[in-house]
Amino acid sequence: MLNHRYHHYFHRHHHLNHHLYHRHHHHRHHHHRHHHRHQILHQNRHQIHQILLSLNNKIMGYAIFLFLSILLHLVYLVIHRL
């Protein structure tokens, strides 16, 4: 559930950045050759975004796992102390 909300936030944030980026660079888009290069860049950015998302999910999963293991360890220590 946490992961989903985080994912949604990340996606929204990325889109906001994308919008700002496009608005900022819009007045230079007169050359057709440049536009083609931008299209390639856009495709690359999409691929990078996908890689980042999968990496992000792995990191989140690992972080949750780490957090749970620490929590279990703490609980174990508390029980042992009693």
UniProtKB/Swiss-Prot annotation:
**Assigned keywords, A-Z:** Malaria
Which superkingdom, per the lineage? Answer: Eukaryota
Q: What else is known?
A: This protein is coded on the reverse strand of an aspartic acid-rich protein.
The protein's name is Histidine-rich protein
Q: Which organism is it from?
A: Plasmodium falciparum (isolate fcm17 / Senegal)
